[in-house]
């Protein structure tokens, strides 16, 4: 699949779910994309395209759908996978930060030993909305003395302005809507 077509491919394989998880929110359901092996493979290939094997030490996946996409990205890059989870979901000591969501507030955590100082970290998630979750991920990476090298998303909801809260040069989205 040519890279120029990846946005169209993603758009053709997601569905909008109105009023989920709360009234006024249009949820971007990526499960149709995940169910098609060739489409899922093309998405993973597109997400790793800007990075060389060995240039990323850890790939962060943000709970929950970010896990699904980040793990194969980590595998392709020869990097470790690090889950960032909602508060109280990790079994070991954690670093945490709270942030605003499109529809409320949340806290995410990462294990205190998830990164080594200086680790080069790529953050992968399914959707960039307000940028709160991604900014929180960057904060946790910084707290751990690691270095974020990129933020990659399947879908960017441009109207919500999330890109403006993040280092613009680090943000890559396969589809901007």
From Swiss-Prot:
Pfam families (alphabetical): Pribosyltran
TM helices/strands, residue ranges: none
Alphabetized SUPFAM superfamilies for the sequence: PRTase-like
Localization (cell): Cytoplasm
EC numbers: 2.4.2.7
Catalytic activity: AMP + diphosphate = 5-phospho-alpha-D-ribose 1-diphosphate + adenine
Entry keyword set: Cytoplasm, Glycosyltransferase, Purine salvage, Transferase
GO MF annotation, one: adenine phosphoribosyltransferase activity
GO cellular component: cytoplasm
Entry annotated with the keyword Glycosyltransferase: yes
PROSITE patterns (alphabetical): PUR_PYR_PR_TRANSFER (PS00103)
Single GO BP term: adenine salvage
Family matches, as InterPro entries: Ade_phspho_trans (IPR005764), PRibTrfase_dom (IPR000836), PRTase-like (IPR029057), UPRTase/APRTase (IPR050054)
UniProt cross-references to Gene3D superfamilies, sorted A to Z: 3.40.50.2020
Enzyme class: transferase
CDD domains on file: PRTases_typeI
This protein's pathway: Purine metabolism; AMP biosynthesis via salvage pathway; AMP from adenine: step 1/1
Physiological role: Catalyzes a salvage reaction resulting in the formation of AMP, that is energically less costly than de novo synthesis.
Family named by the database record: Belongs to the purine/pyrimidine phosphoribosyltransferase family.
NCBIfam families assigned to the protein according to its UniProt record, in alphabetical order: apt (TIGR01090), PRK02304.1-3 (NF002634), PRK02304.1-5 (NF002636)
HAMAP family: Aden_phosphoribosyltr
Subunit structure: Homodimer.
Name of the featured protein: Adenine phosphoribosyltransferase
Lineage, broadest ranks: Bacteria, Bacillati, Actinomycetota, Actinomycetes, Acidothermales
């Amino acid at each position: 699949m040519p890279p120029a077509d990846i946005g169209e491919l993603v758009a053709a394989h997601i569905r909008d779910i109105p009023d989920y998880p709360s009234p006024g929110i249009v949820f971007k359901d990526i499960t149709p994309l995940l169910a098609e092996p060739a489409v899922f493979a093309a998405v993973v290939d597109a997400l790793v395209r800007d990075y060389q094997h060995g240039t990323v030490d850890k790939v962060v996946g943000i709970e929950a759908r970010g896990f699904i996409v980040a793990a194969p990205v980590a595998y392709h890059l020869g990097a470790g996978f690090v889950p960032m989870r909602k508060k109280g979901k990790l079994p070991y000591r954690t670093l945490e930060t709270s942030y605003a969501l499109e529809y409320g507030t949340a806290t995410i955590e990462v294990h205190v030993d998830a990164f080594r100082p200086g680790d080069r970290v790529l953050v992968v998630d399914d959707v960039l909305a307000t940028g709160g979750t991604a900014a929180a991920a960057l904060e946790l990476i910084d707290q751990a003395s690691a270095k974020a090298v990129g933020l990659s998303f399947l879908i960017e909801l441009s109207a919500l302005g999330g890109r403006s809260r993040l280092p613009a040069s680090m943000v890559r989205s396969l589809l901007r809507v």
